[in-house]
C-alpha cells in the first residue's frame, strides 16, 4: 500500500426494498473496494432499506408500514454489521438508511447517513432538507456535523441538500476536507445533478464524493441517474460509474486530500459574510411567494 496516496471509492447501487439483499450487496462492494486498497467507500441514500416508491404520490398504508417496520436505530443490527465490514477492511464507510429514534410509541423516522470506520460507529447525519413526500415519512435534521477521521475531516449531506449551496458551504466552513453526498437522484433531472455536484466541489475547493442509486426501483416508478462520482477541488470529475451499477475509485495524493488547493483566489479569505444579510431570513419565501415545482 502506498502511504503517499489514498484510494477513494463510490458505489452506484440498485437498492431494493429488502434489507438483507442490500446488506449482501454492501459486502460485495466493500470486498471490491478493499481489493483496490480503498480507505473510504460511499454508498447511496436509503440503500439499506430502499427509498420511497415515488417522490410525489399518495402514500399507501402498506408503504408507510414498510418504512416504519424496517427502520432501525443507530447503533443497531445493520450498523453493527456494516461496522464489522469496515473493521475487517480497515475502511471508512458511509451509507444511507431509514433511522428510527424512540421518542414516541411509534418512533420517529429520519433519512440518515451513517459513518462507520475501523473504530466502529463514528456518527450519523440526518437529512435537513426534505423534498416531496419525504415530509410525510421523515422528520428533518437540524445540524451539519463534521467528523474527524484518520483520512481527514468528513462532512455529510444527502440528496436534496445538494440544491442548497449553503449546506456544502457550512460543512466546508466547519473544516470538511471531503464532502460526501449519498443520494437517490432521479434520472429525469440528471442535468441538475451534473451541475450541482461539480459546483459544490469547486466553490468550496474540496473533494466531493457522490454515491447515487441506479436503475429502476423495484417498487413504484422511480428510475435513478447513477453516475456516482469522485470530483476534485477544481470541479473536475476524476472517476464516474456511468449509468450502470458498479464502483468507481480514484487514488489521490494525501497532501492534496488534506488541504485546500489555494490558488491566486482564496474564496474563504475573500468571503464577505456581513453582506449576505438575507441568507438567514425566514421571511424571504413568503415575500417571493410559492412557486410551482416540477413533478419528479
Outline where the language-model segments fall.
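CN hydrolase (nitrilase-like) catalytic-core segments centered on the catalytic cysteine
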Residues: 71-94, 162-248
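Cys-nucleophile CN-hydrolase/nitrilase-fold catalytic domain and related Cys-dependent amidase chemistry
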Residues: 19, 28-118, 186-200
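C-terminal beta-strand edge segments of enzyme domains
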Residues: 146, 213-296
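Active-site-proximal beta-strand elements of phosphoester/diester hydrolases
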Residues: 5-17, 112, 124-127, 153-161, ...
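N-terminal active-site segment of His-dependent metallophosphoesterases
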Residues: 1-40, 180
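Conserved beta-strand and immediately adjacent loop positions that scaffold enzyme active sites
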Residues: 7, 94, 112, 143, ...
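Amphipathic beta-strand/beta-sheet edge segments enriched in Tyr/Trp
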Residues: 106-127, 222-242
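Active-site beta-loop-alpha substructure in enzyme catalytic cores
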Residues: 34-43, 132-204, 208-211, 290-296
Amino acid at each position: 500500500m502506498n502511504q503517499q496516496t489514498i484510494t477513494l471509492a463510490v458505489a452506484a447501487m440498485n437498492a431494493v426494498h429488502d434489507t438483507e439483499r442490500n446488506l449482501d450487496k454492501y459486502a460485495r462492494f466493500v470486498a471490491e473496494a478493499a481489493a483496490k486498497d480503498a480507505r473510504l467507500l460511499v454508498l447511496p441514500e436509503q440503500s439499506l432499506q430502499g427509498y420511497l416508491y415515488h417522490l410525489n404520490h399518495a402514500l399507501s398504508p402498506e408503504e408507510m408500514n414498510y418504512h416504519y417496520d424496517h427502520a432501525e436505530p443507530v447503533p443497531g443490527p445493520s450498523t453493527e454489521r456494516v461496522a464489522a465490514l469496515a473493521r475487517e477492511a480497515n475502511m471508512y464507510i458511509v451509507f444511507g438508511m431509514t433511522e428510527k429514534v424512540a421518542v414516541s410509541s411509534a418512533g420517529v423516522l429520519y433519512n440518515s447517513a451513517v459513518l462507520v470506520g475501523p473504530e466502529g460507529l463514528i456518527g450519523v447525519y440526518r437529512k435537513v432538507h426534505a423534498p416531496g413526500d419525504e415530509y410525510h415519512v421523515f422528520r428533518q435534521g437540524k445540524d451539519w456535523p463534521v467528523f474527524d477521521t484518520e483520512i481527514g475531516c468528513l462532512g455529510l449531506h444527502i440528496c436534496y441538500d445538494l440544491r442548497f449551496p449553503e449546506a456544502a458551504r457550512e460543512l466546508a466552513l466547519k473544516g470538511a476536507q471531503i464532502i460526501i453526498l449519498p443520494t437517490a437522484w432521479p434520472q429525469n433531472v440528471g442535468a441538475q445533478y451534473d451541475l450541482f455536484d461539480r459546483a459544490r466541489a469547486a466553490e468550496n475547493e474540496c473533494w466531493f464524493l457522490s454515491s447515487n442509486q441506479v436503475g429502476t426501483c423495484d417498487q413504484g416508478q422511480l428510475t435513478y441517474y447513477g453516475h456516482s462520482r469522485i470530483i476534485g477541488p477544481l470541479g473536475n470529475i476524476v472517476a464516474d460509474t456511468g449509468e450502470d451499477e458498479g464502483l468507481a475509485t480514484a487514488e489521490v495524493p494525501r497532501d492534496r486530500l488534506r488541504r485546500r488547493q489555494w490558488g491566486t483566489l482564496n474564496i474563504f479569505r475573500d468571503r464577505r459574510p456581513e453582506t449576505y444579510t438575507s441568507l438567514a431570513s425566514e421571511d424571504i419565501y413568503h415575500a417571493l411567494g410559492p412557486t410551482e415545482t416540477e413533478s419528479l
